[in-house]
Amino acid sequence: MCLIKWFKEMRKRRRDRIYEGPYEDGGVIVNDDPQAKKSVESRDLISFYLKYSTLAFLEEDTNLKSGVYCLGACLEKDGSAVSCTVDCSDGIDVGSVRKEMRSIEFLSRVDEILKKYDVASRNGYYHNVQGLPDFYGVKVDASYSSGESIYCFDNQEAFLPIELLRELCTLFDVKNITPKDYGV
Protein backbone atom coordinates (compact mmCIF):
# COMPACT_ATOMS: atom_id res chain seq x y z
CA MET A 1 0.00 0.00 0.00
CA CYS A 2 1.25 3.44 -0.88
CA LEU A 3 2.58 5.36 2.12
CA ILE A 4 0.45 8.42 1.36
CA LYS A 5 -2.69 6.30 1.01
CA TRP A 6 -1.89 4.60 4.33
CA PHE A 7 -1.53 8.01 6.06
CA LYS A 8 -4.85 9.20 4.62
CA GLU A 9 -6.68 6.06 5.74
CA MET A 10 -5.11 6.26 9.21
CA ARG A 11 -6.16 9.92 9.56
CA LYS A 12 -9.70 9.13 8.40
CA ARG A 13 -10.04 6.33 10.97
CA ARG A 14 -8.70 8.65 13.64
CA ARG A 15 -10.96 11.55 12.72
CA ASP A 16 -13.97 9.22 12.57
CA ARG A 17 -13.32 8.42 16.24
CA ILE A 18 -13.30 12.06 17.35
CA TYR A 19 -15.96 13.71 15.13
CA GLU A 20 -19.15 13.02 17.04
CA GLY A 21 -21.99 15.15 18.31
CA PRO A 22 -24.62 17.68 17.26
CA TYR A 23 -24.28 19.57 14.01
CA GLU A 24 -26.82 22.37 14.52
CA ASP A 25 -25.67 25.97 14.97
CA GLY A 26 -24.51 26.53 18.52
CA GLY A 27 -24.02 22.82 19.11
CA VAL A 28 -20.73 22.08 20.83
CA ILE A 29 -18.61 19.04 20.19
CA VAL A 30 -15.81 18.49 22.68
CA ASN A 31 -13.78 15.35 22.37
CA ASP A 32 -10.42 14.07 23.43
CA ASP A 33 -9.39 10.92 21.60
CA PRO A 34 -8.31 8.44 24.30
CA GLN A 35 -6.24 6.49 21.75
CA ALA A 36 -4.21 9.51 20.63
CA LYS A 37 -0.60 9.39 21.76
CA LYS A 38 0.37 12.35 23.94
CA SER A 39 4.01 12.20 22.91
CA VAL A 40 5.88 11.70 19.64
CA GLU A 41 9.09 9.70 19.56
CA SER A 42 9.97 10.35 15.93
CA ARG A 43 12.08 13.33 14.89
CA ASP A 44 11.28 12.94 11.18
CA LEU A 45 8.44 15.36 10.50
CA ILE A 46 7.17 14.99 6.93
CA SER A 47 4.23 17.42 6.89
CA PHE A 48 2.97 20.24 9.06
CA TYR A 49 -0.01 22.59 8.99
CA LEU A 50 -0.97 25.27 11.50
CA LYS A 51 -3.92 27.62 11.40
CA TYR A 52 -3.78 30.12 14.27
CA SER A 53 -6.16 33.04 14.72
CA THR A 54 -5.04 36.10 16.67
CA LEU A 55 -8.26 38.01 15.99
CA ALA A 56 -9.28 37.74 19.66
CA PHE A 57 -5.96 39.16 20.90
CA LEU A 58 -4.73 42.72 21.17
CA GLU A 59 -1.81 43.39 18.83
CA GLU A 60 0.05 44.99 21.74
CA ASP A 61 -0.12 41.69 23.65
CA THR A 62 1.04 39.45 20.82
CA ASN A 63 3.48 41.66 18.89
CA LEU A 64 1.78 40.25 15.79
CA LYS A 65 -0.78 41.74 13.44
CA SER A 66 -4.30 40.63 14.27
CA GLY A 67 -5.33 38.00 11.76
CA VAL A 68 -5.34 34.36 10.74
CA TYR A 69 -1.95 32.73 10.17
CA CYS A 70 -1.84 29.58 8.06
CA LEU A 71 1.60 27.99 7.91
CA GLY A 72 2.36 24.77 6.08
CA ALA A 73 5.39 22.66 5.24
CA CYS A 74 5.61 19.36 3.41
CA LEU A 75 8.54 17.18 2.40
CA GLU A 76 8.72 16.86 -1.39
CA LYS A 77 8.19 13.37 -2.86
CA ASP A 78 11.87 12.97 -3.71
CA GLY A 79 12.86 14.01 -0.17
CA SER A 80 15.27 16.68 -1.36
CA ALA A 81 13.42 19.81 -0.25
CA VAL A 82 10.50 21.15 1.75
CA SER A 83 7.63 23.06 0.18
CA CYS A 84 6.47 25.86 2.50
CA THR A 85 3.27 27.88 2.35
CA VAL A 86 2.42 31.04 4.27
CA ASP A 87 -1.07 32.56 4.09
CA CYS A 88 -2.03 35.46 6.34
CA SER A 89 -5.32 37.31 6.34
CA ASP A 90 -6.96 39.81 8.65
CA GLY A 91 -10.30 38.00 8.88
CA ILE A 92 -12.00 40.36 6.41
CA ASP A 93 -9.73 40.50 3.39
CA VAL A 94 -8.39 37.33 1.89
CA GLY A 95 -4.63 37.08 2.18
CA SER A 96 -2.42 36.00 -0.64
CA VAL A 97 -0.34 32.88 -0.47
CA ARG A 98 3.45 32.86 -0.49
CA LYS A 99 5.08 29.57 -1.48
CA GLU A 100 8.75 28.74 -1.37
CA MET A 101 11.18 25.85 -1.12
CA ARG A 102 13.36 25.27 1.93
CA SER A 103 16.04 22.76 2.91
CA ILE A 104 15.02 19.52 4.60
CA GLU A 105 16.44 20.80 7.91
CA PHE A 106 13.48 23.19 8.00
CA LEU A 107 11.11 20.43 9.17
CA SER A 108 13.56 19.51 11.96
CA ARG A 109 13.35 23.07 13.25
CA VAL A 110 9.53 22.97 13.10
CA ASP A 111 9.63 19.69 15.06
CA GLU A 112 11.88 21.26 17.71
CA ILE A 113 9.35 24.07 18.20
CA LEU A 114 6.46 21.57 18.45
CA LYS A 115 8.37 19.60 21.08
CA LYS A 116 9.42 22.75 22.97
CA TYR A 117 5.77 23.73 23.45
CA ASP A 118 4.64 20.11 23.95
CA VAL A 119 1.98 20.31 21.25
CA ALA A 120 1.72 16.50 21.21
CA SER A 121 0.17 16.63 24.70
CA ARG A 122 -2.93 18.14 23.02
CA ASN A 123 -3.05 15.39 20.39
CA GLY A 124 -6.59 14.18 19.76
CA TYR A 125 -8.20 17.28 21.29
CA TYR A 126 -11.20 18.47 19.28
CA HIS A 127 -13.53 21.34 20.25
CA ASN A 128 -16.00 22.62 17.68
CA VAL A 129 -18.79 25.15 18.12
CA GLN A 130 -21.11 24.80 15.14
CA GLY A 131 -21.92 28.04 13.36
CA LEU A 132 -18.74 29.93 14.25
CA PRO A 133 -16.86 31.44 11.31
CA ASP A 134 -13.77 29.65 10.03
CA PHE A 135 -11.37 32.35 11.15
CA TYR A 136 -11.19 31.63 14.90
CA GLY A 137 -9.21 29.17 16.96
CA VAL A 138 -6.28 26.89 16.25
CA LYS A 139 -5.69 23.77 14.18
CA VAL A 140 -2.50 21.71 14.11
CA ASP A 141 -1.94 18.74 11.80
CA ALA A 142 1.52 17.16 11.74
CA SER A 143 2.67 13.81 10.34
CA TYR A 144 5.89 11.90 10.95
CA SER A 145 7.64 9.27 8.82
CA SER A 146 7.07 6.71 11.59
CA GLY A 147 3.30 6.99 11.15
CA GLU A 148 2.87 9.06 14.29
CA SER A 149 0.81 12.20 13.97
CA ILE A 150 -0.48 15.19 15.90
CA TYR A 151 -3.95 16.57 15.28
CA CYS A 152 -5.71 19.07 17.51
CA PHE A 153 -8.44 21.58 16.75
CA ASP A 154 -10.47 24.26 18.50
CA ASN A 155 -12.54 26.76 16.53
CA GLN A 156 -13.41 28.90 19.54
CA GLU A 157 -10.16 29.79 21.28
CA ALA A 158 -6.42 29.70 20.79
CA PHE A 159 -5.46 26.91 23.18
CA LEU A 160 -1.76 26.92 22.27
CA PRO A 161 0.58 29.66 23.54
CA ILE A 162 1.11 32.73 21.38
CA GLU A 163 4.87 32.21 21.79
CA LEU A 164 4.52 29.08 19.63
CA LEU A 165 3.07 31.19 16.82
CA ARG A 166 5.75 33.85 17.25
CA GLU A 167 8.55 31.30 16.90
CA LEU A 168 6.91 29.67 13.89
CA CYS A 169 6.38 33.09 12.27
CA THR A 170 10.09 33.79 12.74
CA LEU A 171 10.99 30.42 11.23
CA PHE A 172 8.58 30.84 8.30
CA ASP A 173 9.86 34.40 7.82
CA VAL A 174 6.51 36.07 8.57
CA LYS A 175 7.16 39.66 9.60
CA ASN A 176 4.03 41.21 11.12
CA ILE A 177 2.38 41.14 7.75
CA THR A 178 -1.13 41.86 6.62
CA PRO A 179 -2.69 41.12 3.24
CA LYS A 180 -1.89 44.70 2.22
CA ASP A 181 1.81 43.88 2.66
CA TYR A 182 1.32 41.18 0.04
CA GLY A 183 -0.14 43.75 -2.35
CA VAL A 184 -3.76 42.65 -1.90
Predicted regions and their residues:
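Short, solvent-exposed coil/turn segments at beta-strand boundaries
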Residues: C74-A81, S145-S146
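Short, well-ordered, aromatic-rich surface patches in folded extracellular/luminal domains
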Residues: L3-S66, S96-V184
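Acidic/histidine-rich, surface-exposed loop or edge segments in extracytoplasmic proteins
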Residues: V82-V97
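Generic structural motif
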Residues: F48-L50, S80-C84
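Short, surface-exposed charged micro-motifs
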Residues: C70-C74, K139
